[in-house]
């Protein structure tokens, strides 16, 4: 093939390197198009066009970003590496002019014309060769970066074309200068260009040497740390009027960013020292990479940037009310907190910790607080975190070291005063790598977090402007950490609250997400109420939202399958067509008064429920047994109730010997569900008295309260959930401990209006409300045992013989 024949071949763009003919060079290739170009070349004639990029930092270059002249190279060896990159060994052959360059889907391809080398006058070539070698030798004495053995290798090259290309390849000059040498097909012109370039570089090196000496003499010992900066200034002063560089070097760029970052004086001194180290290092050294990464992190961390905080409490209340239905006490406490912060213009104060079951809006409440105050929002999930370095970071001496997640999040959000949500703070763990909860102590203590020290940064960072809010599902938080936070409890939503949330927010949200138009789907309140009661059992509304989403999906399918159907209405009658059979049944009050059967009230993580307690008495020897997956505390409560009954047996008219002649069995149905706690004490005691007196218990009465050995009714927890369960189950009268009257303020008005709530102090008051009649004892009939026939003595043969 003639050298001037046009041909098409794949193109490999190069960054920071120019490959000359006669050069053998390894290349590391990682870009997909470049790898495709190599594969195409390997499948053809193993030749590829190597072209340098005009800008080395371009990841995806266009045809305009490549030079017009490249080098045709043979692929000697190609090796695929484990990280999906490719190492290829190439040998330059000859120059080529790009006539047209196409950016294909797989790779670049170019239509090229090989460039024929010309030599010029032979005598002038000899003179130029001698001058170039002489100047190169002089250049080596000034620039110690070029190995001296290259001169010996160049002197052994007879071919002037190869000599010029080899010398150009080894000169430490810019890519632009090397590309200019590559584009010169005439050898004489190329040698003259190299000669001029080396003379210019030698002049600069001479000036640099002279300046360095002069600056060194002028500096005192106290100024030695600034030696390199003075050197650069002197060089620029000497070069005034010359050709300016197109770009500022990397160190100077970092220096400008450090100045703009607004760091405190001590932090800036630390970073300046690191910059000085970086200037004296080779850019390719591993330590330079570590220092560069450290400085970039220090620049990214916000030192003075702040977002403007809103102080309009009325507007904040509107935002909270719009985003969350109910939660009045929680929102009131948050507004109090924001009001104090607005008045003091500081964030210092208690760290809020929102504690409640899943799905009640803890995380979204944190987002709403950020919206209400105008702060940027950043969230850090602590679930499963067990390494202290996740909070404090790794020391930068470790390979791959990074700041802790706290500093990383601050760098990402870009301001000093965001709302920082520590999500699932109770899910942290600890192991041999440290205890992240202990690391958080410094973060959450207002007296200490002004000087938070990340192991990677190695300087103090002020976190006092950050508004921290934590969330947790339980109080299972280390004591010292809990002591630094103010707990705000979010109980489960009431039935009315769930209904309102579904009708106002969830339904519209799911209709939009599932592509339904306005009017195509109507879900009545009765259907939502049935979903809450029979298809979900939760404290929050996540399950409720999933069920509504299921209805929307089925509605979309039905509308597409039946084009004549224009709209769908879902109510309690046809709900099972969309959600299937009912999954749950909530407790309902019995309609008949029964002996030994009492309705108690239970608290669960998903709300309250009715708890039926059954008692039976049979002839026996005074054995007390209990079944129904009862916990230790509940078993002890039964024993306490039995002692109360025995102590009051005479007063209640119960045969004092019942505990010797009767077996008592207490059973709590739904035996597969574990039950525990002391709050069923008065219910257990009432059931025992009803059983032993034959006096029925009113079916419309439910009760909750712990019993003491002296018959006093002690306070309990979860009153709100228990009263909601009683209201839902059709109970008319509820007995609660007198000490829990203060908790009635939290109960919705509609619930209190529909329940007759009586506060009781003793078991006597409980019996007055719960029993159908005043308690009277039962005379247990003594069962006479039939006389047994005398046992006949059996004698052995030997005994008979004796007698």
From Swiss-Prot:
Residues 9-202 form the Lon N-terminal domain. NCBIfam families: lon (TIGR00763), PRK10787.1 (NF008053). Keywords: ATP-binding, Cytoplasm, Hydrolase, Nucleotide-binding, Protease, Serine protease, Stress response. This is Lon protease. SMART domains: AAA (SM00382), LON (SM00464). Signal peptide: none annotated. It is found in: Cytoplasm. Its EC number is 3.4.21.53. Gene3D superfamilies: 1.10.8.60, 1.20.5.5270, 1.20.58.1480, 3.30.230.10, LON domain-like, P-loop containing nucleotide triphosphate hydrolases. ATP binds at residues 356-363. It is an enzyme of class 3 (hydrolase). ATP-dependent serine protease that mediates the selective degradation of mutant and abnormal proteins as well as certain short-lived regulatory proteins. Required for cellular homeostasis and for survival from DNA damage and developmental changes induced by stress. Degrades polypeptides processively to yield small peptide fragments that are 5 to 10 amino acids long. Binds to DNA in a double-stranded, site-specific manner. Homohexamer. Organized in a ring with a central cavity. The gene is lon. Its main location: cytoplasm. Belongs to the peptidase S16 family. The lineage of its organism: Bacteria, Pseudomonadati, Pseudomonadota, Gammaproteobacteria, Pasteurellales. Induction: By heat shock. GO terms for molecular function: ATP binding; ATP hydrolysis activity; ATP-dependent peptidase activity; sequence-specific DNA binding; serine-type endopeptidase activity. One of its GO terms (biological process) is protein quality control for misfolded or incompletely synthesized proteins.
């Amino acid at each position: 093939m003639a050298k001037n024949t046009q041909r098409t071949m794949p193109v490999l763009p190069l960054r920071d390197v120019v490959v000359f003919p006669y050069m053998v060079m390894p290349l590391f290739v990682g870009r997909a198009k470049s790898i495709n170009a190599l594969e195409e070349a390997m499948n053809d004639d193993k030749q590829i066009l190597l072209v340098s990029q005009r800008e080395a930092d371009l990841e995806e270059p266009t045809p305009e970003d490549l030079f017009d002249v490249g080098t045709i190279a043979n692929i000697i060896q190609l090796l695929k590496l484990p990280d999906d990159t490719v190492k290829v060994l190439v040998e330059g052959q000859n120059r080529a002019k790009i006539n047209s360059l196409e950016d294909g889907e797989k790779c670049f391809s170019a239509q090229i014309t090989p460039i024929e080398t010309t030599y010029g006058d032979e005598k002038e070539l000899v003179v130029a060769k001698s001058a170039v070698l002489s100047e190169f030798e002089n250049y080596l004495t000034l620039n110690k970066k070029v190995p001296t053995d290259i001169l010996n290798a160049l002197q052994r090259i007879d071919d002037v074309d190869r000599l010029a290309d080899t010398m150009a390849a080894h000169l430490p000059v810019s890519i632009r200068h090397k590309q200019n040498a590559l584009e010169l097909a005439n050898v004489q012109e190329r040698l003259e260009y190299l000669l001029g370039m080396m003379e210019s570089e030698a002049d600069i090196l001479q000036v640099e040497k002279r300046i360095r000496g002069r600056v060194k003499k002028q500096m005192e010992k106290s100024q030695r740390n600034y030696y390199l900066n003075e050197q650069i200034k002197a060089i620029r002063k000497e070069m005034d009027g010359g050709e300016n560089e197109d770009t500022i070097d990397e160190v100077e760029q970092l220096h400008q960013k450090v100045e703009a970052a607004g760091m405190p004086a001590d932090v800036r001194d630390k970073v300046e020292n690191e910059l000085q180290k970086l200037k004296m290092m080779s850019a390719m050294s591993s330590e330079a990479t570590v220092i560069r990464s450290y400085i970039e992190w220090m620049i990214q961390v916000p030192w003075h940037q702040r977002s403007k905080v809103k102080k309009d409490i009325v507007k904040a209340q509107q935002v909270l009310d719009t985003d969350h239905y109910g939660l009045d006490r929680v929102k009131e406490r948050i507004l109090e907190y924001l009001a104090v912060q607005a008045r003091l213009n500081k964030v210092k104060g208690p760290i809020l910790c929102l504690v409640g079951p899943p799905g009640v809006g803890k995380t979204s409440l944190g987002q709403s607080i950020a919206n209400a105050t105008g702060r940027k929002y950043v969230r850090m999930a602590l679930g499963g975190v067990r390494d202290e370095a996740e909070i404090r970071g790794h020391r930068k001496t470790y390979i791959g070291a990074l700041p802790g997640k706290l500093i990383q999040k601050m760098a990402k959000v870009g301001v000093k005063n965001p709302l920082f949500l520590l999500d699932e703070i109770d899910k942290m763990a600890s192991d041999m790598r440290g205890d992240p909860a202990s690391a958080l102590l410094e973060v959450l203590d207002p007296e200490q977090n002004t000087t938070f020290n990340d192991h990677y940064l190695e300087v103090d960072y002020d976190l006092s402007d950050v508004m921290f809010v934590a969330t947790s599902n339980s109080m299972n938080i280390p004591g010292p950490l809990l002591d630094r936070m103010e707990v705000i409890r979010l109980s489960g939503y009431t039935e009315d609250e769930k209904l309102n949330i579904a009708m106002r927010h969830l339904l519209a949200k799911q209709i939009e997400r599932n592509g339904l138009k306005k009017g195509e789907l109507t879900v009545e309140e009765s259907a939502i109420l049935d979903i809450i009661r029979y298809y979900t059992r939760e404290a929050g509304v996540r399950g409720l939202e999933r069920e509504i989403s299921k209805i929307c999906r089925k509605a979309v399918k039905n509308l597409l399958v039946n084009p004549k159907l224009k709209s769908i209405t879902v109510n309690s009658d046809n709900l099972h067509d969309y959600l299937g059979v009912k999954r749950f049944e909530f407790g309902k009050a019995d309609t008949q008064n029964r002996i030994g059967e009492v309705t108690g009230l239970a608290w669960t993580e998903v709300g309250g429920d009715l708890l039926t307690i059954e008692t039976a008495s049979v002839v026996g020897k005074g054995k007390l047994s209990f079944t129904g997956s009862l916990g230790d505390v509940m078993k002890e409560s039964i024993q306490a109730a039995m002692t109360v009954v025995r102590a009051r047996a005479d007063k209640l008219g119960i045969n004092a010997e019942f505990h010797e002649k009767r077996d008592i069995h207490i059973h709590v149905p739904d035996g597969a569900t574990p039950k525990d706690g002391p709050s069923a004490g008065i219910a257990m005691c009432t059931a025992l008295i009803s059983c032993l007196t034959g006096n029925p218990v009113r079916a419309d009465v439910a009760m909750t309260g712990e019993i003491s050995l002296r018959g006093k009714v002690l306070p309990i927890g979860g009153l709100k959930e228990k009263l909601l369960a009683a209201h839902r189950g059709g109970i008319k009268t509820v007995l609660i401990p007198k000490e829990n009257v203060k908790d009635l303020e939290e109960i919705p008005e509609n619930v209190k209006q529909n329940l007759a709530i009586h506060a009781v102090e003793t078991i006597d008051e409980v019996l007055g409300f719960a029993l159908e009649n005043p308690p009277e004892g039962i005379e247990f009939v003594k069962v006479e045992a039939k006389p047994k026939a005398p046992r006949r003595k059996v004698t052995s043969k030997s005994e008979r013989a004796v007698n």
